[in-house]
Amino acid sequence: MDGIGEGHGPNGMGYDMPMLMNQHTPIFGAYGPEGSPVTTALPNPSLHDEASMSIGDDNNDAKRRRIARACDMCRKKKIKCDGKMPKCSHCINYKTDCVFTQVEKKRNPPKGAKYIEGLENRLGRMESLLRLSGLLSEDDGKTDLGTLEKRLADRSLSAGGYNATNSPTRFSLPLNGQPSQPASTSRHSTPRVDSHSSPRTAATSPESQKESENEVEGLSDMMCSLVTNNCGETRYIAYIDDNKWMYWKPEIFSDVFARRVFKPLPPKEEALSLFRDFFDNFNCMFPLFHEPTFMHLVEKQYSRDPYEGSGWWASINVVLAISHRLRVMSNLVPQEEDKKAWLYLKNAMGVLTELTMRNTDLLSVQALLGMSLFLQGTPNPQPSFFLVAAAIRLSHSIGLHKRGSGFGLNPVEAEQRKRVFWIAYMLDKDICLRSGRPPVQDDDDMNVELPSEDPPDNIGNVPLFDGKGKFNMFRTLCKFSIIESKVYKRLYSATASKQSDGALLNTIGELDRELEEWKDSIPIDFRPEHEIKATHGPLILHIVVLHFAYYNCLTTIHRMSVHHGYWTSRLSNYAIQGLNARPLNPRVFLSAVLCVTAARASINLIKYIPQGDFACVWLILYYPVSALVTLFANILQNPTDARARSDVKLMNVVVNFLSTLVSDESNGSIKRMLGVCGEFERIAQVVLDKAERESQSKKKRKAGPEEPRDSPQAASTTSTKKNTANTSATMPFSPPPQYGADSQDSSSNAANGATAFTSSQTMPGTSSISDMSGTIPAMPRASQDFTEMLGPNALDGLNFNSQPPLTSTGDVPIAQPFQQPFVPQDLWQMPMTIEWDWADMSTNFPVFDSGPSH
């Protein structure tokens, strides 16, 4: 038995020990090529026997290789056989025949062999994936890992790395055991495992922490990969699965995936004309498709061998639908042509199940986004919500949310992937901010760059009117969507609601500053708060939407401070006491003024909207109606405002705009919206008339002998109540009784400059809305019914009511009716849009009556 395992070789066992992998320089001990232990790292070689120390002796190697096992006699006696020829020493002494019987013994696999085999299989699969994605050539499979790592590092350095002296304390140990030069790191460099790293840690060195973040990001970027199958579908490497729908096609789903055609494709000449309208008027600002690629597939579609992919079928029908819609909006064709657009959309919707359940290609994402853009021009936003969410989820499966520097894509394809993702991102964040629903895309789990500012195909660029420059509107809209995302996440998310007063005020100031910087980066020709000078119809619509979105975002930021009443004495005291950790943005003190000014500017944009029942109206209808509610709340709060009369006229502009949309019985939702907005306008007019009468009455009382304070006001209230009840039907609305007078904070407001909407509130004789309870008949649960009438964001303007009127001269305090907002914060954050509310108010809508008789 002692002879077993003393030597291994072809003479003894018939095979050599396998070379498992590239041999490393031994550090703590290893095994030689023959499988014997190498003990160069051990301090006392005398602990081993002579045979184990004589590995380098050729004669001894030959003898040891010859003794695969002891002779038969020595094995029988269980003594050590020296293996001498022709007889061993023991056989000579015992005078017996020395016979070596060769017995084939199958050795058990060494411990860990299955684990190593598994690693080899996994490595082989990884190499095959890398070859499929183009990251690894056929010869790279034989390349040493250290060489491959060095090649990747050199490639990243040539792409823009910085000097190696930026990280002098970091070294990497190559496989040959020689220390290398200090390794340079960059944003895209290959992360190295440090064998002899500096004792500095991230906790003690901010620089090392930053380097670590860059390395992790670089590693994440390099680990991303795409794999394209034989059908042309591209999958993100993180989504690879053997159980694909393309292999699992049970018969029960055959009819679900059947392609139903509601309207055949038009002739080629007509189709080319429609496609030209799409790319000239829509895709130039919203680059959903790459025109050369799309037109190549169009030529193939009208050939004998068309491309049969469901993503392409949906895409071509979506483009036809949008093209017909554009012609109807431009009055180039009759309104009846819109029916063709809907039929082509139905063609695309016919493969919706297949797009979401089976496909993983870019065309499917583009088709879903195109359907969402088309359906935004409808009263019901629910389909658009679903389609955008599906498009973003599908974009994750093909890696659109990642930078993709290692995907091996050509610049044109990489740019188009960025454009498609940013379109989905913009739609997602716009839905999020307007509806209060959480976004689908997490900003912390994406690193794709913005679209190019000056792309070769000139997509997104708009020439300036002086002819000396151009402006990329698409990239600007992408930047704006990032700000929208921050506004929701930092002000309206569940986590944001837990902020302290100081954190909330600072957040409002920071977001306002970022929004203003974005606005100032826009050329004067297209900048919000400036006159629109464009003459091209489709371009005007894009600019109008840009301005509407800016004013809405500005209001969404500042209404948070109005909602909490921070712009009253609470805000002033907070700043005076020095509770803020850093200086506040001065515009925080002007939140209410900014909201009302933005509402006025939004209504003034109505003149640029195409008149008539066009689909684009539903896209922007939210903005003017929300602005009307903002002005309505301001008039209720400040009826003596110098611009109150002009604000009522602006409300009338919105009412007239809605009246032009009511063309048939199918627009029931617009009719209900028109009824509510018209009633708001009428109530605002009543409030202003009452305020003027009260002001004149108080002036007369000051001029004449002093009378009891309560008698005239009571008489006036009674008479006004009777007059109002007899003139016309009124909306059953009145402020809740808890909005009583409390003038305690008025003096501090006057002292600290936290004024109301305009300086006209210092006029004597300012009346409160609580005094007008007779003018507007009482209604139980007013605040609850009010929230049922309006969508969450449309009601946000009503939060402008926290500013109390300043105290008038004398000892008569002016009542402060709206110390609390109309709507609690959790109500106007409900996941609904104003369009959805207006369309589904048949059961919640209050009945307009004359109120209770007196």
Curated annotation (Swiss-Prot):
Q: Where are the transmembrane segments?
A: 616-636
Topology with respect to the bilayer: Single-pass membrane protein
Top-level lineage group: Eukaryota
Gene Ontology cellular-component terms for this entry are: membrane; nucleus
Record's keyword annotation contains Flavoprotein: no
* Pfam families linked to this entry: Fungal_trans, Zn_clus
Q: Assign the protein's first listed, main location to one coarse class.
A: nucleus
Record-annotated DNA-binding residue ranges:
71-98
**Which portions of the chain have biased composition (kind: Polar residues)?**
163-188, 198-207, 755-773
Q: Which organism is it from?
A: Emericella nidulans (strain FGSC A4 / ATCC 38163 / CBS 112.46 / NRRL 194 / M139) (Aspergillus nidulans)
List the PROSITE patterns hit by this protein, alphabetically: ZN2_CY6_FUNGAL_1, ZN2_CY6_FUNGAL_2
MF annotations from Gene Ontology:
DNA-binding transcription factor activity, RNA polymerase II-specific; sequence-specific DNA binding; zinc ion binding
Cellular location(s): Nucleus; Membrane
Where does this protein have compositionally biased stretches of type Basic and acidic residues? 691-710
Name of this chain's protein: ABC-transporter-regulating transcription factor
**Which keywords, in A-to-Z order, does the entry hold?**
DNA-binding, Membrane, Metal-binding, Nucleus, Transcription, Transcription regulation, Transmembrane, Transmembrane helix, Virulence, Zinc
Name the phenotypic consequences of knocking out this gene: Results in a hypersensitivity to miconazole.
